[in-house]
Amino acid sequence: MKFDILTLFPAMFDGPLTESIIRRAVERGFVDISLHNIRDYATDRHRVVDDAPYGGGDGMVMKVEPLAACIEAVKAERPAARVILTTPRGRRFDHDAARELAGYEELIIVCGRYEGIDERVRDLFVDDEFSIGDFVLTGGELAAMVMIDAVIRFIPGVLGSPGSAEYDSFADGLLEYPQYTRPVEFRGVQVPGVLLSGNHAEISRWRRQKALELTRRVRPDLLHKAELSSSDRDCLAMLEREGEP
């Protein structure tokens, strides 16, 4: 999968895109990531990429010409690439959105800055817009990093275990169950006995119940769209009767 990131601050991506799973994905040829400095496409001697907004107001707006030139240069090499803009105005980026974007072979991610971009960039070039939450960041670079990390997890072969992405939190609409590893006891706190039993059916049942409990307590809104079986609903009803928080 090919990612082209359009940004005013390419150095911000050192580290997040050069370590851990993303680094291994690049080294193994599953992912190709290129950074493009929008400022390189400014045509004036001072390489200006922003200007005051028409109509007045605070802050500056990213100019259309450098952005257009940068997008067109990348699209000339990858005409089928989907152009994504990171912006608070976008639709919510979540587990399903990450899976959706993983279905594309080429993505161009435009990182917004300042008070936003000239609207004509949206009108002429952008295919989709995403926001990672109801808050404002200094720029779209951090959002782009989050999105790339989440999308890459769905690329076959990237994760060590083929089922890892499918068992993550949100994969089936629920938060993930609690995880434990050695030692069995730490400062008086024991690993639940069922996880040591070797009974895979009981372990699966325990994990599902804990996922339901956690989701009900922390993110009850997720239950409205989760894929719940009749036994899941029975478990939730039992928790309600027992007054579990």
Swiss-Prot record:
It is found in: Cytoplasm. It holds the Pfam family tRNA_m1G_MT. Its EC number is 2.1.1.228. Its main location: cytoplasm. This is tRNA (guanine-N(1)-)-methyltransferase. It catalyses: guanosine(37) in tRNA + S-adenosyl-L-methionine = N(1)-methylguanosine(37) in tRNA + S-adenosyl-L-homocysteine + H(+). GO terms for cellular component: cytosol. One of its GO terms (biological process) is tRNA N1-guanine methylation. The keyword Transferase applies. Homodimer. Coiled coil: none annotated. One of its GO terms (molecular function) is tRNA (guanine(37)-N1)-methyltransferase activity. Specifically methylates guanosine-37 in various tRNAs. Keywords: Cytoplasm, Methyltransferase, S-adenosyl-L-methionine, Transferase, tRNA processing. The lineage of its organism: Bacteria, Pseudomonadati, Thermodesulfobacteriota, Desulfuromonadia, Geobacterales. It comes from Geobacter sulfurreducens (strain ATCC 51573 / DSM 12127 / PCA). It is an enzyme of class 2 (transferase). InterPro entries: Alpha/beta_knot_MTases, tRNA_m1G_MeTrfase_C_sf, tRNA_m1G_MeTrfase_TrmD, tRNA_m1G_MTases_N, tRNA_MeTrfase_TRMD/TRM10.
